[in-house]
């Protein structure tokens, strides 16, 4: 695996020498704007692999994306390669529909230590929940970013990530009640502890998430990519673009329903993805918002 190929894939041409917050932020932003958060393998009849060589081939060489276990594993490798002190952590994702955090550790995120300060770096949550900058690991501090205001809080060794969102304007009235829309201004995202993990800790859940009928990842096909102003999402046959803070503390959310040919065209034109196998778009009943 070639670190230069990774940086070429994300379009990063800046310094790799300074192991500071500015460099970490720059790399994170390049990755989330180049590498989609997506689960299309599942809906093309292919596996979501955890092996780093396979992930590198999929994302860097074949210009695909991946889900958190893949894109954050790749980010962990890249940051470690250039000298950042990086630790894999495990997260428990909040389900709004059930009003609770997952019982299984289904999310992979990173802790990066710079000059004695700890930061959370996560390139694998996508949609309008995706951080654009690393979050300083300080309990109770509001950390405003372009997508929203993020906050980390700690209680008896467990950390919680939440966000305060803007109002949203949906010009296409047909989608005002879409099940893809986040309805809450305040939103819990996930919890985690600071216990170091390895990729092996995620092997069983990686299998479960792509095989179980109860998994949102088998219920819905999705692809999400950040832009300098917002985020594109394709869920099943529905394409959305959210422009953050387009006016008066309000996000603009545009919806469009695509046919199969348009899905293929938009995957290529918006997400830079050309699939090798046929995609079966799916919008099942499991809770998933953009």
UniProtKB/Swiss-Prot annotation:
Q: Which GO terms of the molecular function aspect are on file? A: arylamine N-acetyltransferase activity
According to the UniProt entry, which residues carry N-acetylmethionine?
1
Keywords in alphabetical order, please: Acetylation, Acyltransferase, Cytoplasm, Transferase
> Where, by residue number, does substrate bind?
106-107
Q: What's the domain of life for this entry?
A: Eukaryota
Q: Which InterPro entries match?
A: Arylamine_N-AcTrfase, Arylamine_NAT_domain_sf, Papain-like_cys_pep_sf
The record's catalysed reaction(s) read: an arylamine + acetyl-CoA = an N-acetylarylamine + CoA
Mainly localized where?
cytoplasm
One GO CC term, this protein? cytoplasm
What is the role of this chain?
Participates in the detoxification of a plethora of hydrazine and arylamine drugs.
Give the protein's recorded name.
Arylamine N-acetyltransferase 1
Organism of this sequence: Bos taurus
């Amino acid at each position: 695996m070639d670190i230069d190929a990774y940086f070429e894939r994300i379009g990063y041409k800046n310094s790799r020498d300074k192991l500071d917050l500015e460099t970490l932020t720059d790399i994170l932003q390049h990755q989330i704007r180049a590498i989609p958060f997506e689960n299309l393998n599942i809906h093309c009849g292919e596996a979501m692999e955890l092996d780093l060589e396979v992930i590198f081939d999929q994302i860097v060489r074949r210009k695909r994306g991946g889900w958190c276990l893949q894109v954050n594993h790749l980010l962990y490798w890249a940051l470690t390669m250039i000298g950042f002190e990086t630790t894999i952590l495990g997260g428990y994702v909040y389900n709004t529909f059930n009003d609770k955090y997952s019982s299984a550790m289904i999310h992979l995120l990173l802790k990066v230590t710079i000059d004695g300060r700890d930061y959370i770096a996560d390139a694998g949550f996508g949609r309008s929940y995706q951080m654009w900058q690393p979050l300083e690991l300080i309990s109770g501090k509001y950390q405003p970013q372009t997508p929203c205001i993020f906050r980390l809080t700690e209680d008896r060794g467990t950390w919680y990530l939440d966000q305060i969102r803007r109002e949203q304007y949906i010009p296409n009235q047909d989608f005002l009640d879409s099940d893809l829309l986040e309805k809450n201004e305040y939103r819990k995202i996930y919890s985690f502890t600071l216990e170091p993990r390895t990729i092996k800790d995620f092997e069983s859940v990686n299998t479960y998430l792509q095989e179980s009928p109860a998994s949102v990842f088998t219920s819905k096909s999705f692809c999400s990519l950040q832009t300098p102003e917002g985020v594109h999402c394709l869920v099943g046959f529905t394409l959305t673009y959210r422009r953050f803070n387009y006016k008066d503390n309000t996000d603009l959310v545009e919806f469009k329903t695509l046919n199969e040919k348009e899905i293929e065209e938009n995957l290529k034109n918006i997400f830079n993805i050309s699939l090798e196998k046929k995609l079966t778009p799916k919008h099942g009943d499991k809770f998933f918002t953009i």
